[in-house]
Swiss-Prot record:
Region (Disordered): 406-431
Main location: periplasm
Organism: Burkholderia orbicola (strain AU 1054)
Subcellular location: Periplasm
Name of protein: Tol-Pal system protein TolB
Assembly description: The Tol-Pal system is composed of five core proteins: the inner membrane proteins TolA, TolQ and TolR, the periplasmic protein TolB and the outer membrane protein Pal. They form a network linking the inner and outer membranes and the peptidoglycan layer.
GO cellular component: a single term: periplasmic space
Length: 431
C-alpha cells in the first residue's frame, strides 16, 4: 500500500470471519506476457501413468518453466517416457532441446504417489540426476513445483521458487479476502475474509506465519496468522494506527509503524505481542520498515528531508546510529524491500505523474525502473531474488505483476476474474 494511503488511515467498522481452511472461489490467473531475451530449450516428456491423476505433474512442470521466462518448451510428443528408459540424447538435441526430462508417477498400496524423474543434458550427453518424491492427491502440484525447481537450479545455477507461496488480498464486491496460494496462483486458500480492508501481508522467514493489518475493530491492528494451525492472534493494538509489519530474519520480532505519540514512528514488538520498543525519534513521519536479510539494518520511508525517501538505520534503532538516506534518484520514493542476498533495493518512485517500480544496486547506488506499468506499489522479492512481485493496474483493473529484478523481460500479469487483487507478498523458501 502506498505511503499516502497508509498515512491516511480511516477508522472503519468491520465484520470479520476467519476461514483458514477454506478454498478460494476467486483465484489468481497468470497471463504470460513476455519472456527473457535468452531462453533455455528443454523437452519434458509426459510422465508415465498420469492419465487418471487429479493433477498432471508434467503439465505443472512445463507451465512453471514457461512462466519463468527463462525456458522454452520443445514439443516432446505424446508418448510417455519413464525415468528408467534408454534415451537417445542426440536425437533430442537434434530436435532443438538442450535438456530432456523423463519420469513416472506410481501409486502405492497406501494411496500415495511415488514421483520419479531424471534430467539430462543433451549437449554434454549426460545425466544431471533427479528426485524421488512422495505425494498425495493434494500435494501432486507441490511435487511438480519441486521438479521444476530442481530443473531451474541444475540448468541455470539459481535455486527455483516454484514451490514457494504467495499472499495477497482479493476484493470482490464489498468483501476482502487474504489468500495464500502456490507461486502460480493455484491451490489458493482463504486465510481471512472480511467486509473491511486487509492490508500489508508479510511472510515470516520461517514460512509458517503471515502478519497483516486488519481494520475489523474500527482501526488498523496488526495480527499474525499461523498457517499450520489456522490460528491467528493480535500483535499490536496500540493507540492510533498500527501498520506496516515486517519480520526480523529470525522470525522472533516485528518492526511496525505506530502513531502512538502522534507522528508515525518505527517500533519493534516481539512476535508474541510483548516487548514494545521505539526505534526512531524524529518529528517527521517514519513508516514502512523492512529488515535487511542479515538483520543489521532496518530500511524505512521517511519525509524527514521534506519528501518521502528511503533511509536505513541500525536494527537497534537510531540510538545506535543515525539514519542514513539511501535513495537519491527521484524526489518521492517509498516502499523499500531488500533482496534476499542484501544486494538490491526495490522501491516505488513517483515518476512523470505515475508510480514505477525501481531497483537499486545497494553497492553502487545505481537505480533503474524495471516495469512498463505506471501505477505500481507494494514490491516483494522472490526468495531467490530473481523476480519482483508487485501490484499495479492493467486494463483498468487492479492486478499483480511479476518482473525479473533486472528488468530483462516484460511483467507477467496475475489477475482475478470479476475482482481486484492487491497487497502482494512473495513467501520465502519452504522449510
Amino acid at each position: 500500500m502506498s505511503l499516502m494511503t497508509k498515512l491516511g488511515f480511516r477508522a472503519l467498522v468491520a465484520s470479520c470471519l476467519i476461514t483458514a481452511g477454506s478454498a478460494a472461489n476467486a483465484q489468481v490467473n497468470v497471463l504470460i506476457t513476455g519472456v527473457g531475451s535468452t531462453q533455455f530449450p528443454i523437452a519434458t516428456a509426459n510422465f508415465t501413468n498420469e492419465a487418471n491423476l487429479p493433477q498432471q505433474v508434467t503439465s505443472i512442470v512445463r507451465a512453471d518453466l514457461a512462466r519463468s521466462g527463462k525456458f522454452t518448451n520443445i514439443d516432446a510428443g505424446s508418448t510417455p517416457v519413464p525415468e528408467t528408459a534408454s534415451v537417445d540424447l542426440g536425437a533430442w538435441k537434434a530436435k532443438g532441446a538442450n535438456a530432456f526430462v523423463a519420469g513416472s508417477v506410481n501409486r502405492d498400496a497406501n494411496g500415495q504417489y511415488k514421483v520419479n524423474f531424471i534430467l539430462y543434458d543433451t549437449v554434454k550427453q549426460q545425466s544431471l540426476g533427479g528426485l524421488s518424491l512422495t505425494a498425495t492427491d493434494t500435494t501432486l502440484r507441490t511435487a511438480g513445483h519441486k521438479i521444476a525447481d530442481y530443473i531451474y537450479q541444475k540448468l541455470l545455477g539459481v535455486r527455483g521458487v516454484f514451490a514457494t507461496r504467495l499472499s495477497y488480498v482479493i476484493k470482490t464486491g464489498n468483501r476482502y479476502q487474504l489468500q495464500i496460494s502456490d507461486s502460480d496462483g493455484q491451490n489458493a486458500r482463504i486465510a481471512l475474509s472480511s467486509t473491511e480492508p486487509i492490508i500489508s501481508p508479510a511472510w515470516s522467514p520461517s514460512s509458517t506465519k503471515v502478519a497483516y493489518v486488519s481494520f475489523e475493530r474500527k482501526k488498523p491492528i496488526v495480527y499474525i496468522h499461523d498457517l499450520p494451525t489456522g490460528r491467528r492472534y493480535m500483535v499490536s493494538d496500540q493507540k492510533g494506527n498500527n501498520s506496516a509489519p515486517a519480520w526480523s530474519p529470525d522470525s522472533n520480532t516485528l518492526a511496525v509503524a505506530l502513531s502512538l505519540t502522534g507522528n508515525t514512528q518505527i517500533y519493534t514488538v516481539n512476535a508474541n505481542g510483548g516487548g514494545l520498543r521505539r526505534l526512531t525519534q524524529s518529528s517527521s513521519i517514519d513508516t514502512e520498515p523492512f529488515y535487511s536479510p542479515d538483520g543489521r539494518w532496518i530500511y524505512f520511508t521517511s519525509d524527514r528531508g521534506g519528501a518521502p525517501q528511503i533511509y536505513r538505520m541500525p536494527a537497534q534503532g537510531e540510538s545506535a546510529g543515525a539514519a542514513q538516506r539511501v535513495t537519491f534518484t527521484g524526489s518521492y520514493n517509498t516502499s523499500p524491500r531488500v533482496s534476499p542476498d542484501g544486494k538490491l533495493l526495490a522501491y516505488i518512485s513517483r515518476t512523470g505523474g505515475g508510480f514505477k517500480l525501481y531497483v537499486q544496486d545497494l553497492q553502487t547506488g545505481a537505480a533503474n525502473a524495471i516495469t512498463n506499468t505506471n501505477r505500481d506499489e507494494s514490491p516483494s522479492f522472490a526468495a531467490n531474488g530473481q523476480y519482483v512481485l508487485y501490484a499495479t493496474q492493467s486494463g483498468g483493473r487492479n492486478v499483480l505483476a511479476a518482473v525479473p529484478s533486472d528488468g530483462s523481460a516484460p511483467p507477467q500479469i496475475l489477475s482475478v476474474q470479476g475482482g481486484s487483487v492487491r497487497e502482494p507478498s512473495w513467501g520465502p523458501f519452504m522449510q
